[in-house]
Amino acid sequence: MASKPIGRAGDVQFAADGLFEFLRIAGQADAEFNKKMRIAAEQVAQHVVDRAKVNAQGQPKHGQNRPGSSGMSQAQAVVNGLRARRDRIPTIKLDHKRGFVSASLPNRKRKTKVTMGDVFFGAEFGGRRRPTTQQFLRHRGRQGYFFWQAVRDSNSFIAKEYSDAIDRVLKELAQGAT
């Protein structure tokens, strides 16, 4: 089963060929299948979120420490907004409306509030090409610094663990039916 990530950077799902058709048929056959698959897929997605958090810990701080600075890199602050969602396929969502906490210039002093979604793409893919993106690390194209790196590194784990989870759920349901 070859899996591939689909979606945008802040909202990604992992799917394989024919997976959606299989999930539809299996979900219609037994309602308990959907419940158990949601729990199993959330555990697989949580592994990727944990890897992204580890990758974000390794990111350098952006610029000099200033008075009132939290001492965290933007990646460390943004990765706290990533959540593994309970869906039938492993899904990760960014809480993009959540406020981005800045100790040096807090949101209460700003007219337009800064959100996690505003900072995520710069922290993940970089910037420095325009005057408005100088606070980010250098641009790395589609490579990514912490989140997509975790997705790529976990690709084989996701495929294996998710297919094992499908097998476990089907075996549990088969034992319960007899």
At which residue positions do the language-model features occur?
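Short helix/strand-capping connector loops at secondary-structure junctions
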Residues: Q135-S154
